[in-house]
Structure formats: C-alpha cells, structure tokens
UniProtKB/Swiss-Prot annotation:
The modification N6-(pyridoxal phosphate)lysine is found at residue 722. It holds the Pfam family GcvP2_C. Gene3D superfamilies: Aspartate Aminotransferase, domain 1, Type I PLP-dependent aspartate aminotransferase-like (Major domain). The glycine cleavage system is composed of four proteins: P, T, L and H. The lineage of its organism: Bacteria, Bacillati, Cyanobacteriota, Cyanophyceae, Nostocales. InterPro entries: GcvP, GDC-P_C, GDC-P_N, GDC_P, PyrdxlP-dep_Trfase, PyrdxlP-dep_Trfase_major, PyrdxlP-dep_Trfase_small. Keywords: Oxidoreductase, Pyridoxal phosphate. SUPFAM superfamilies: PLP-dependent transferases. This is Glycine dehydrogenase (decarboxylating). PANTHER family: GLYCINE DEHYDROGENASE (DECARBOXYLATING), MITOCHONDRIAL, GLYCINE DEHYDROGENASE, DECARBOXYLATING. It catalyses: N(6)-[(R)-lipoyl]-L-lysyl-[glycine-cleavage complex H protein] + glycine + H(+) = N(6)-[(R)-S(8)-aminomethyldihydrolipoyl]-L-lysyl-[glycine-cleavage complex H protein] + CO2. Residues 1-20 are annotated as: Disordered. It comes from the Bacteria.
C-alpha cells in the first residue's frame, strides 16, 4: 500500500503531494480502463500508423475521411465510462431487481437444466461464440458437425426428411413456413388457416407477416373448419397451447385434398413420446429447441427449427448444412444449396434470414448428444408423469382439467373458485401461472419440476384447507398416444453420455474451427471485434437467465431498467427519438423498419406508396426484406467510384414519385467509403414523399462521429452483434433493434401478451418475445457502459485508422477498388483481385483458401463486387496483428508472381492446392512442384503456432448434387 506520508517532508510540499496522489489515482484508473483493453493498438501503434498515412492525429484523419457536413460536433451524452468491475457491480444491482419466480406459464417457454459441461464449454467458451458463419467450411468443420447433429435430431424427432440449421424463434419459423407454403402451394388461394390453439405470439407474428403480402389469416377451430374458403396452407400447434393433444390426421387429409400444405408447430421434447408430425402427414414442422438446455433469458436467444420434405429443399429458409467431400475424397461438411439464400437471390428470395441461432443450436444438439434418446425420453416421461399426478390431485380438489390427453400442460377450469385467490396463493409462493381468462389458468411443467413443487401447486388450489391426499396416492400411468418409431439412433447420440467423453468431443470439434481465439477475422461488413469476457459474464446470471418472457412486469424491473437505459443510449448514439429492441436479427431489423415505414404511409392514406429504391451494391437482405414488406424493388445504379449515382437516383425518384415508399441505403456505403452526397440523397427521397431507411451494418464507422438521424435517415437498424459486441456465435445469435425519427415512434412493434406501451397503430409483433433475445442485451449494455462517449468515439476512429493502414500497406500489391474524396476508406476496404485470373489463373477462392495456411480466415469474398475481397479489421486488432495479416497477403501475392513469371505451374501450385492439411503433407507421395515446408510453414509465425484445417478444399458442387443434411454412418468419417 502506498503511504503518501513518506513523501510529505514539509507543509510546503503538501500541494505537490496532492498532485502526486491524483496522478497515481489516474494511473490506477488507466490500468483498469476498459477502453485500453478493448482497443487493440497502443498509443505508439496509433501514432506509427498515422505516420504511415501522413496524418498528425486521429482527428486529422477523421477530418479528411468523414464529410464535414455530417460530422457530429458535440460529445455524445452518455454516462461516464466505468471499469469492468464497476460496470459488473452496477449491472448486478440492476439484475437484483428482477424476481426469479417458478414460472409454469408455458406457451413455448420452459425452465430447463443446462448441463454444466455444455454451459462451460460452449456458452462460456470464446472458441465457440466468437466464430463467424461457416462460409469458409474448411475451418468450420467443428460447428458444422454440431449443426449436422442438430439437423439430424430435428429430422428424427419430427419424422420429416430435411431440416435447417436453426431459425430465430418459433413464431418466426411459423411465419417462414407460411411464406414457403404460399410459394409452393399448387392452388391459387391467398388465405391461410391458423388454429386458435396456437400460441398467441405465433398468431400475432403470422398476422404481422401476412398483412403486407396480402395474405388473409383465418383464425379458427381446426375441428369445425369446413374448408369452404380455399386455403393454401395451415398451421396447427402440437400439443396445443392449452396442452391438448389432438389427432390432426383428418384435418391434414382434407387440407391436402385442397392442395394446401400443413405446418405443425411441435414441442420437440414431446416428440420423444408422441407420434411425430411427419408420420401423420405434416408437410412442415417448426418449433423451438429452448427446452433442450437453453435458459429462458426473458425470451431468448433460442434456436428454432424448421423441417420439411425433401421436395422443398430449395425453398427452405435459412442455412442448411450438407455433406460433401474434399479434394482427397474425405467426407466434409459445408453450407448447402446457398443459391436459394437472400445474398444470392436478393429480391427473388422467399426469406431474408441471414443470421440465425447457431450457438444455441449447437447447445441444443449437444443436450441431445449428452442425454441420448433414452435420456430425453426419461426427461419427457418424468415431466408427463408429474403432470398426470398434478392433474389427478387437482381433480380431487374439485377442479376440472379441460383435456383428456396432454403432455406437460394443463388448462384448469376454476369453476366457482376465485381467480384472485389463486393468484394471491401464487404470489405468496413465488409462482407464475398462465391466465387464460377469469375462469381458467394454465400450468406447464418442465424438467426442473419436483414432487415438492406439486405440493405447492396443490396447496394454492386447496386454499387454507389441508391436502386430502399425498403425492404417493396419485401416481398413475402415462396417458399418451405414444410414438412407435425410433429416433436418435446415430452413434453420435449414443456415445458421449459421460462428461469426460462429451468434454473431449466438444474440444475436438472446437479445435477444428478458426475463431477470434486464433486470429483476426477480417470479414468486411461483419465487424468481428472483441467480445469481452466482462460483457459475456452477465449472460449466465440467473437473474437474467431464469425469467419467463411473459412473467408479470412487476417481476422484471431489472430488465425494464436495462431496456430503458439501453434504448436511451442507442437513441443518443443514432440521433433518433425512439428505439425498439424486439427484432432479434439484423434481417428482422430491416424488415421491422420497412414495416414501420409502410404503416406510416398507410396512416396518411398513402397505401399506394410501395416502391423501394435500393442501390445495386446493397446487401441481399435489403431487397429480400423489401419484398417481404410488399414493396416493389427498383434498383439504383452506382457510379464508377462506387457511390450511388445521384442522377440515376433523381430520375428513379421522379419516375416513381407517386409510389415512392422508401430508399434503403447503407452508410458508410457497402463499398467502404463515406459518400459525400448522403444528405442530398436523403433530401431527394424526402422531396418525393419517401422515407429513408439506413442499413446500420456499417455503424462501427459512425458511432460518436456522425449519426443517422442527423444525416437525414428516418429509420436505421443496428446490428448489436457487430457494432455493440454481441458475439456472432458461428452464425447467431444477433439482435437488430431499430431507431426511428419522432414521426415514426407510434408505429414501433407491439406484442399480444405483455403489450408494449406503444400506440395502437403499432405494426404488431415481429418476434415471439416482447424484447426479442433479451438476455444478450446485457452484452451491449456492458460495452457502452464501459466505453462511455469518449471510448466509443475513439473505437470508431481507430477502426477507420486500422482499415486505412491496411489499405495503405496493401495498395501496391492489390488495387484498393474504392476510396473517398481524399483517397481514404471508411472502416473497411475492397481489394481488387480480378486481374489475377488473367495473369495467373488465380480465382478469389484460391487466395481465400491459401490464407488458411497462414492462419487467417478470409475477408468477405466477391461482395459487394465479384472478384474482390472486402477487409474490415475493427478497432480491436493490434498493429502487430494487422501487420501479420498484411504480410500474409503480401507473401501470397509473391506466390502469385511466381506463377505469373512461369516459375510455378498454373494448376499445381500453392494456391490451387490450398488449404494443406497435415494428412496431405505426410501421407502418400508428394506430387507438387513446391516443398512441404512451403505449403505448411510459409512464414515464420506459423512455426510458433499453426492452425491446421481438418479437411482439404471442399467440393461444393458435389454436395449440392448429392444432397444429404443428416448424419452419415460413422464409417463415412474415417
């Protein structure tokens, strides 16, 4: 401990002693300063990079990079930056205001037990949560295998033929099923039947999704629906929302006779006991895997599933993992059938889904791997046994159970008993039930329920009377239409049931993948920045994790404080009047923002406004989202500099002035520059009565420097999994909240269960839960709290510095395709590789795969311009890491030069044969005109640490021609 008395020699030195104390305190503060932990380059690094670029300061760089007309000339009004310790303490205080009740509300959400081996080694493991979507499959075989397990699990449980690798939530999955049914149904109907037994949130999301597409939603009883009104599809809940298990065969047969497709929203745990949807005729099955070990999290994130028949494989939304082979004939996995996705089909895509819920799908799959078929069945039987016992006790207490057949949920008719008395008993015991109405309540049990819990529940209904029975008297046999087919028979679900075995399996998979624990991931438009441990810790807190999304608001005051603060911070950062946190992915943020614009026009009697202008450089989700909102996409050209062609914009806006609804624009542009004409662009749209939707994918170059609302945007979505540090999770989770100008606030999303406090003119629900994937919002809260206004602004400046440093170092080797007015880029740069095809027969994939040999994930390839790579380093990477990456690309350029000079074969060379696996180096005859050393250790640092791909280059076409999306026999992996 420092003693200031030791340096206090006289009263004359008192002032200097105080100064020394202040300096020491400041130094101590600096050592705990999260900003320095988050931003990669040191002060010396920053100055060196500025010197290379010819600037004296970061402010000087920003002045030349960002147009002066849009720069923010004031400090963001945010709380002072806190240390990691202080921020965690503050958030813990907020979390303590949440009350963790035992929730038996059900409605698709259940308390569950996350096996500690899965929680510690997946959810809390950066090797899993910092990876990106597996677009480079050679360095993603681990999570691809885990996702193949997920798909196999869903295929087996549902009895259908194919499944995807997750969707955002059950309600969204049901909406995707409706859209797919609309697209493939052979009849011309535009009506869709929705059983009134579906969960309320699912019905609301379906209504939201249907309206702009002109689909009529018919809500009714499947038992009495007469099919006089032609329908193209239907959705049924299994078991029903009130717990009833129906036999849907007759309904499905009648629907099929009319040419309609039937979707069944099924609880996957119940399918370990119940007849699977595929066996009674369902065309599509959707649902949530939340109860497979995923915390409630006040609504998410959770992995939904989507299964269907193989004939619809090219219409399935989201990612599908497929089996293929590498160049050596070894079984390998990859994302299959990508040509059906939004980044390829754009406005012709049937879905805008991009980010989904990979991390949660991995957890759910491993829950099934760990428990196996017998373990899952035992969990389901225990839950059902307790439910049967609970029902028998309630009957003895004089209550009526509305259903004869049920799995885990009871609808209890109260008769002459008073609801308020029941609820008072619940409150006294910290219990939540579902309230159907004044006459009935619902009780849904889960794997955490114990016999002691049943006693508490019975006592609530017994009131002050003693229970006239004991639990032992009530045990009865299972009462279900049991499935006869087997499931989860693959060895992967029957091998890893000890913690030791599962731990090793998880580690083997993890080490096959390149994540941020390995090296920088320089993907343009993806912002793969640090996901700090201190930001991630609160996700695991029970106060956030064990809250049901429909718990009374009086029990979730901590969450409400979190939401209010985060909304206010994001509104200040974006310059908007209101923020909605419900959209649970960037794609859903786009969709929500456009729906808000659509609703705004409708409120003004301008329903004819349905044209959306979109630059040709836009991300594929933009046109896909616009079409989902019932808009007609009109493309706007870009000029030779990569900017929006303002003359073409003016012409298109003038031509479609009467119908103009919106412009979708990304800023900085998808070409990586701050377009000087952005304010004029916004003004043109407004002059024709349109609204400006700004895609916030590149917000990491704006925070603290400029704001969408000030620039002229009316709506902007934020990718919290980019700019605000939620990890990508290998392909999700994400969050896509939107900010809106004051005239649009009243249209922000609502919710049918908890409501939203918004104007009745709201667009309805866009996600199953009121605040989307609420539990991961703590990550962004922590990031902003620890960075403060100065830290956030500094991060933006350094992100721009890092990108310009890379562009400068590489421009003599690879042309930088687009630059701003002063020869600078924003937070990312596009390197033009197109000439290499002619000079050396080198494709962009060759460079991407060769980077793996150097230990790097490739930048974004062939987007937004074919034959280019887009590099985004973020602010979190040090100069040393930037130099390593640049050195790798420079070395690769020298390898290409050897081909150009005729020193290396144009087909058998280091790039064409990349990546090189250990097996390819040591097994068999070496038939290449370069050494094994050149292949494996091209630069010195690869000798210190080498990331080895587990497979060679994958044959993508083979996988699509021979489509398989479930686990192969184990011998196939040998």
């Amino acid at each position: 401990m420092v003693s200031y008395a030791s340096i206090r020699q006289s009263s004359d030195e008192a002032d200097s002693t105080v100064d020394a104390s202040q300096k020491l305190d400041a130094r101590k503060q600096d050592l705990n300063n999260f900003i320095q932990r988050h931003i990669g380059p040191s002060s010396a690094d920053i100055q060196h990079m500025l010197d290379v670029l010819g600037f004296s300061s970061l402010d000087d760089l920003i002045e030349k990079t960002v147009p002066s007309t849009i720069r923010l000339h004031k400090k963001l009004q945010l709380p002072t930056a806190q240390t990691e310790y202080a921020a965690l303490a503050k958030l813990k205080q907020i979390a303590s205001k949440n009350q963790v009740f035992r929730s038996y509300i059900g409605m698709g959400y259940y308390d569950t037990i996350t096996p500690p081996v899965i929680g510690r080694n997946i959810l809390e493991n950066p090797g899993w949560y910092t990876a990106y979507t597996p677009y480079q499959p050679e360095i993603a075989q681990g999570r691809l295998e885990a996702l193949l397990n997920f798909q196999t699990m869903i295929i087996d449980l549902t009895g259908l033929e194919i499944a995807n690798a997750s969707l955002l939530d059950e309600a969204t999955a049901a909406a995707e099923a409706m859209s797919m049914s609309y697209g493939v149904s052979k009849n011309k109907a535009n009506a869709y039947f929705v059983s009134h037994d579906c969960h309320p949130q699912t019905i609301d999301v379906l209504q939201t999704r249907a309206k702009p597409l002109g689909i009529e939603i018919i809500i009714g009883d499947h038992q009495t629906f007469d099919f006089q009104k032609p329908i193209f599809g239907a959705v049924l809940q299994y078991p029903a929302s009130d717990g009833t298990i129906y036999d849907y065969r007759a309904f499905i047969e009648t629907a099929h006779a009319q040419g309609a497709l039937v979707t069944v929203a099924a609880d996957p745990l119940s399918l370990t006991l119940l007849t699977p949807p595929g066996e009674f005729g369902a065309d599509i099955a959707v649902g949530s895997t939340q109860r497979f070990g995923i915390p409630l999290g006040f609504g998410g994130p959770h992995a939904a599933y989507f299964a269907t028949k193989e004939e619809y494989k090219r219409q399935v939304p989201g990612r599908i993992v497929g089996v293929s082979k590498d160049v050596n004939g070894k079984t390998a996995l990859r994302l299959a059938l990508q040509t059906r996705e939004q980044h390829i089909r754009r406005e012709k895509a049937t879905s805008n889904i991009c980010t989904a819920q990979v991390l949660l799908a991995v957890m759910a799959s491993m829950y099934a791997v760990y428990h196996g078929p017998e373990g899952l069945k035992q969990i389901a039987e225990n839950i059902h046994q307790l439910t049967v016992t609970l029902a028998e006790g309630l009957k003895r207490l004089g209550y009526k159970i509305s259903s004869e057949h049920f799995f885990d949920t009871l609808r209890v008719e109260l008769g002459t008993n008073n609801l308020e008395t029941i609820l008072a008993g619940c409150q006294a015991r910290n219990i939540n039930l579902r309230i159907f109405d004044e006459t009935a309540v619902g009780i849904s049990l889960d794997e955490t329920t114990t016999p002691e819990d049943l006693i508490d529940l019975w006592q609530i209904f017994a009131g002050e009377d003693n229970l006239p029975f004991t639990p032992e008297e009530l045990i009865s046999s299972l009462n279900l239409p049991l499935r006869s087919s087997s499931y989860l028979t693959h060895p992967v679900f029957n091998r890893y049931h000890s913690e030791t075995e599962l731990l090793r399996y998880l580690h083997r998979l993890e080490t096959k993948d390149l994540s941020l624990t390995t090296s920088m991931i320089p993907l343009g438009s993806c912002t793969m920045k640090l996901n700090a441990t201190s930001e991630m810790i609160p996700v695991t807190w029970e106060e956030f994790g064990r809250i049901h999304p429909f718990a009374p608001l009086t029990q979730t005051r901590g969450y409400q404080i979190l939401f209010q603060q985060l909304e206010a911070w994001l509104a200040e950062i974006t310059g908007f009047a209101g923020v909605a946190l419900q959209p649970n992915a960037g794609s859903q943020g786009e969709y929500t923002g456009l729906l808000v614009i659509r609703q705004y026009h409708e409120s003004r009697g301008e329903t004819h406004r349905n044209v959306c202008l979109i630059p040709t450089s836009a991300h594929g989700t933009n046109p896909a989202s616009a079409v989902m909102c019932g808009m007609k996409v009109v493309a706007v050209a870009c000029d030779a500099g990569g900017n929006i062609d303002i003359d073409d914009l003016k012409a298109k806006a003038e031509k479609h002035s009467h119908e103009l609804a919106a412009l979708m624009v990304t800023y900085p542009s998808t070409h990586g520059v701050f377009e000087a004409g952005i304010q004029e662009i916004c003004a043109v749209i407004h002059s024709h009565g349109g609204q400006v939707y700004m895609d916030g994918a590149n917000m990491n170059a704006q925070v603290g420097i400029c704001r969408p609302g000030d620039i002229g945007a009316d709506v902007c979505h934020l990718n919290l999994h980019k700019t605000f540090c939620i990890p990508h999770g290998g392909g999700g989770p994400g969050m896509g909240p939107i900010g809106v100008a004051s005239h649009l606030v009243r249209f922000l999303p609502g919710h049918p269960v908890l409501g939203s406090g918004k104007n009745p003119q709201n667009i309805g629900a866009v996600a199953a839960a009121p605040w989307g994937s609420a539990s991961i919002l703590v990550i962004s809260w922590m990031y902003i709290a620890m960075m403060g206004a100065d830290g956030l602004t500094q991060a933006t400046k350094v992100a721009i510095l890092n990108a310009n440093y890379i562009a400068k170092r590489l421009e003599t080797y690879y042309p930088v395709l687009y630059k701003g007015q002063n020869g600078l880029v924003a937070h990312e740069c596009i390197l033009d590789l197109r000439a290499l095809k002619k000079s050396a027969n080198i494709e962009i994939d060759d460079i991407a795969k060769r980077l793996i040999d150097y230990g790097f994930h490739a930048p974004t390839v062939s987007w937004p311009v074919t034959g280019t790579i887009m590099v985004e380093p973020t602010e979190s990477e040090s100069q040393a890491e930037l130099d390593r990456f640049c050195d790798a690309l420079i070395a690769i350029r020298q390898e290409i030069a050897a081909i150009e000079a005729g020193k290396m074969d144009t087909h058998n060379n280091l790039l064409k044969n990349a990546p090189h696996t250990i097996e390819s180096l040591i097994v068999g005859e070496w038939l290449h005109p370069y050494s094994r050393e050149q292949a494996a250790y091209p630069v010195s640092w690869t000798r210190e640490y080498k990331f080895w791909p587990s497979v060679g280059r994958i044959d993508a076409a083979f996988g699509d021609r021979n489509f398989v999306c479930s686990c192969l026999p184990m011998e196939a992996y040998n």
